[in-house]
Amino acid sequence: MLNINFVNEESSTNQGLIVFIDEQLKFDTSLMALDQQHYGLISKTIQNKLQFRGNYGQITIVPSVIKSGEVKYLIIVGLGNAEKLTEAKIEELGGKILQHATCAKISTIGLKIMSRINRFTPQTFTSLIASGAFLASYRFHKYKTTLKEVEKFAVESIEIFTDNNSEAIKLFEVKKLIAEAVFFTRDISNEPSNIKTPQVYAERIVDILEPLGVNVDVIGERDIKNLGMGALLGVGQGSQNESKLVVMEYKGGSRDDSTIALVGKGVIFDTGGISLKPSSNMHLMRYDMAGSAAVVGAIIALASQKATVNVVGVVGLVENMQSGNAQRPGDVVVTMSGQTAEVLNTDAEGRLVLADTVWYVQEKFNPKCVIDVATLTGAITVALGSTYAGCFSNNDELADKLIKAGEEVNEKLWRMPLHDDYDAMINSDIADIANIGNVPGAAGSCTAAHFIKRFIKDGVDWAHLDIAGVANSNNASALGPKGAVGYGVRLLEKFIKEYN
């Protein structure tokens, strides 16, 4: 685990020293002094425009020319246009610095910031750099019996010196709690599905949330059946592992404060059921529960901070498997709301799980708004790729606040349309609703959203976040390795705490 230390006096024992320069390549007094201390190494690096231009995210590591002391490298980092810096961009710089230092095998890093960088105070700037580096330090190696040399090395520490360290520490401690919640979400998402059965996943939720003061109720199939959740049970009926409904209630606000409900799709593994998926990349269906993991992670983040909000989270944990008892295309299920649903495609299972879970949370908790998070459709990935998650909502203000929160933490949302024409496409000939649209290949993410919308009560503000394209990545990003991204934790935490 990367150690982030805020110190009261500058140290010369770090192997690497971070230097920030914007695209204007101008030196302030402190940078001039540092350059002189290193015999003009920084200015010489800048003079070589082919080597360093100060562009945002450009990082050049040069060996120190000082023979005495521990500093062996200067890590020169481009800020680009400092006026265009955002919190998200600064965090990404922290992640990039850690990645470059790891490649260069620099085990300890020092950072000194004593003055504002554009609108950011030294305390805010350094806490964001530290947060980005901490997020980027995540690894999932628990099942590797041997590690490659490149995997063995990890940066040990970043030592930060600035004035008013107590303020910087306070800011970073909150960001670290949020990052640790992201790590839980990444961990449980990366976990192989033979390990994270619905029962095991539910136990892990209990283990991490109950010590934080969150009331957790794990509901088994007998009680799920008594609740009338035929849609959820239908998805899981082909699996040997019992489906679970996990209800998490965090009461950090007053009795008079309204409740926000978070609902997550928790399909532990999705074969597609009888409507079998292609075998290529089916292993990635371990991530089909990433929506539920985002919900759990957001509640961890809020509860660990003792945030003064009231939040309830509900996740339906199921496996969509084949067997002699599996749900068939053409089956009709009765949902908890009493509406009947025709299952035309067993691989459109997530919306069936969500239909019962969003209805349950409205019936029991009467929330101010409901936000569901799900890796719901491949269609959203076709539309938005891995840059944006899709946001569907019946309330413009809610959608705008979610999008704004996402921008601030670099978890982007794109507003997608709801329309009566899409709703008409999911009418069934023999039931109240069909689980896919009646025009093959058309508006798949929109018809899926409308399916969920059929189970939202009048007067309830609702947003549906389709995170299928952003939940996991085949490539490393500035803030983490390939695999589970942990998308949604920081977005939901930011929205609930600051925009609610």
Curated annotation (Swiss-Prot):
Cofactor note: Binds 2 manganese ions per subunit.
Protein name per the record: Probable cytosol aminopeptidase
Enzyme active site: 277, 351
Keywords associated with the record: Aminopeptidase, Cytoplasm, Hydrolase, Manganese, Metal-binding, Protease
Cofactor(s) the protein needs: Mn(2+)
Family annotation (SUPFAM superfamilies): Macro domain-like, Zn-dependent exopeptidases
Record organism: Rickettsia typhi (strain ATCC VR-144 / Wilmington)
Binding site for Mn(2+) 1: 270, 347, 349
Binding-site list for Mn(2+) 2: 265, 270, 288, 349
BP terms from Gene Ontology: proteolysis
Pfam family, one: Peptidase_M17_N
GO molecular function, one term: manganese ion binding
Membrane spanning stretches: none
NCBIfam families with a match to the protein in the record: PRK00913.1-2, PRK00913.1-4, PRK00913.2-2, PRK00913.2-4
Annotated EC: 3.4.11.1, 3.4.11.10
Subcellular location: Cytoplasm
PROSITE patterns the UniProt entry points to: CYTOSOL_AP
Record bears the keyword Hydrolase: yes
Entry-linked InterPro entries: Leucine_aapep/pepB (IPR011356), Macro_dom-like (IPR043472), Peptidase_M17_C (IPR000819), Peptidase_M17_leu_NH2_pept (IPR023042), Peptidase_M17_N (IPR008283)
GO CC annotations, alphabetized: cytoplasm
Species lineage: Bacteria, Pseudomonadati, Pseudomonadota, Alphaproteobacteria, Rickettsiales
